[in-house]
Amino acid sequence: MSAGEITEAVRLHKVKRPGGVFWFDLHQIEQNSDGTWLRGPVGSPWGAPHDCGVLSVPVVVLLKVGRPWAAWWVGDPADQRLEIDVCLPPEVTEAGWRYVDLELDPVLHERDERVEIEDWDEYEEAYGNGWMTTDDATLARTTAERCAEVLRHGAEPWLSRGWQLLRQSR
């Protein structure tokens, strides 16, 4: 498959505990040593336990089996950003991909290069209510801190590749 080539739909399942399963119909566009790259152009379908719709902005997603995060480049004109979903390592499924969200999200806001870790409240609630184990909570915290540092330094080649693929998806 060549870079940017659109393939048939791949369903990405994002499990939020206890919120249920969210899904996104995306397209695999590339696979390399960094992982599997998915694209969701404007109009791509998504669903949640109590809602559904289509993407209003383009996204590019990078996943890799065994790595406890999924990166989302979000082409929102008001706040173009890279969000990293800290998660249990993604798994390939018959329909595409699946991961369990561990709530913490390191985010790089491209406009001002600000990096923050979002959703500490959701993390505390999930851990406090027993929706994630102590091991999962530790994985979430350490992975979020490590990913935030990667975003601050900006040296990893996959960071610029994601922005490039996002620009191509417009």
Question: Model-predicted segments: where are they?
Answer:
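Hydrophobic/aromatic beta-strand elements that line small-molecule binding cavities or substrate pockets
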Residues: 26-28, 59-60, 103-107
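Conserved, surface-exposed functional patches that form binding/active-site neighborhoods
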Residues: 77-130
